[in-house]
């Protein structure tokens, strides 16, 4: 934790008052499950809070930055900015991936490189920062880390995987694409959806996500990867 504190201080001028919050933000459920007797807290609740404040601040930014964009345009752009892959990238940019506490099994299976875990970590950190320093501190951090990428227009040029898949398949002729929920597991605050993509009656791929939309995106991403190998 000492090295993480030094990183936050030197790179982002952030000094946490409540180090328990910071430690919780960097504790994955797999680590907490392996240390139940120690009553270790994990970062899912902070992730929930961080997701909400991230959506708010990015919405504020887009509203002020693009006065001529419609609600639909801003929603699409916000989705691109806060998508899982983007947040995982920001975790890596901040070197957060080096400090997350994972269970032994998760560590061995490559969890430290997994976008889902790193995206959740970034949101959990924002939640901890909100509770410790307030929303203005979160705004300053995002202005330093995320907004410069948005200013460069990197996200405006990104299409979502569902759109890319639809455009690719349509080049092959008329196709019927259907996204079907296979399963829905877990408590309300930590849902896990599995979705399949059915094209002309045949299953093309499957995907997982914390919401139906994220699972659909994951399935479309997997489908594009499969089709690129054909």
Swiss-Prot record:
<keyword id="KW-0460">Magnesium</keyword>
<keyword id="KW-0479">Metal-binding</keyword>
<comment type="similarity">
    <text>Belongs to the ribonuclease III family.</text>
</comment>
<dbReference type="GO" id="GO:0006397">
    <property type="term" value="P:mRNA processing"/>
</dbReference>
<feature type="binding site">
    <location>
        <position position="47"/>
    </location>
    <ligand>
        <name>Mg(2+)</name>
    </ligand>
</feature>
<dbReference type="GO" id="GO:0051607">
    <property type="term" value="P:defense response to virus"/>
</dbReference>
<protein>
    <recommendedName>
        <fullName>Ribonuclease 3</fullName>
        <ecNumber>3.1.26.3</ecNumber>
    </recommendedName>
</protein>
<dbReference type="Pfam" id="PF14622">
    <property type="entry name" value="Ribonucleas_3_3"/>
</dbReference>
<dbReference type="InterPro" id="IPR011907">
    <property type="entry name" value="RNase_III"/>
</dbReference>
<keyword id="KW-0698">rRNA processing</keyword>
<comment type="function">
    <text>Digests double-stranded RNA. Involved in the processing of primary rRNA transcript to yield the immediate precursors to the large and small rRNAs (23S and 16S). Also processes some mRNAs, and tRNAs when they are encoded in the rRNA operon.</text>
</comment>
<dbReference type="Pfam" id="PF00035">
    <property type="entry name" value="dsrm"/>
</dbReference>
<keyword id="KW-0699">rRNA-binding</keyword>
<dbReference type="GO" id="GO:0004525">
    <property type="term" value="F:ribonuclease III activity"/>
</dbReference>
<keyword id="KW-0507">mRNA processing</keyword>
<feature type="binding site">
    <location>
        <position position="123"/>
    </location>
    <ligand>
        <name>Mg(2+)</name>
    </ligand>
</feature>
<dbReference type="InterPro" id="IPR000999">
    <property type="entry name" value="RNase_III_dom"/>
</dbReference>
<keyword id="KW-0963">Cytoplasm</keyword>
<feature type="active site">
    <location>
        <position position="123"/>
    </location>
</feature>
<comment type="function">
    <text>CRISPR (clustered regularly interspaced short palindromic repeat) is an adaptive immune system that provides protection against mobile genetic elements (viruses, transposable elements and conjugative plasmids). CRISPR clusters contain spacers, sequences complementary to antecedent mobile elements, and target invading nucleic acids. CRISPR clusters are transcribed and processed into CRISPR RNA (crRNA). In this organism endogenous ribonuclease 3 and Cas9 are required for correct coprocessing of pre-crRNA and the trans-encoded small RNA (tracrRNA).</text>
</comment>
<keyword id="KW-0694">RNA-binding</keyword>
<dbReference type="GO" id="GO:0019843">
    <property type="term" value="F:rRNA binding"/>
</dbReference>
<dbReference type="InterPro" id="IPR014720">
    <property type="entry name" value="dsRBD_dom"/>
</dbReference>
<keyword id="KW-0540">Nuclease</keyword>
<dbReference type="GO" id="GO:0010468">
    <property type="term" value="P:regulation of gene expression"/>
</dbReference>
<dbReference type="GO" id="GO:0003725">
    <property type="term" value="F:double-stranded RNA binding"/>
</dbReference>
<dbReference type="GO" id="GO:0005737">
    <property type="term" value="C:cytoplasm"/>
</dbReference>
<feature type="binding site">
    <location>
        <position position="120"/>
    </location>
    <ligand>
        <name>Mg(2+)</name>
    </ligand>
</feature>
<keyword id="KW-0051">Antiviral defense</keyword>
<keyword id="KW-0378">Hydrolase</keyword>
<dbReference type="GO" id="GO:0006364">
    <property type="term" value="P:rRNA processing"/>
</dbReference>
<dbReference type="GO" id="GO:0046872">
    <property type="term" value="F:metal ion binding"/>
</dbReference>
<dbReference type="GO" id="GO:0008033">
    <property type="term" value="P:tRNA processing"/>
</dbReference>
<keyword id="KW-0819">tRNA processing</keyword>
<feature type="domain" description="RNase III">
    <location>
        <begin position="1"/>
        <end position="134"/>
    </location>
</feature>
<feature type="domain" description="DRBM">
    <location>
        <begin position="160"/>
        <end position="229"/>
    </location>
</feature>
<feature type="active site">
    <location>
        <position position="51"/>
    </location>
</feature>
<dbReference type="InterPro" id="IPR036389">
    <property type="entry name" value="RNase_III_sf"/>
</dbReference>
<comment type="subunit">
    <text>Homodimer.</text>
</comment>
<keyword id="KW-0255">Endonuclease</keyword>
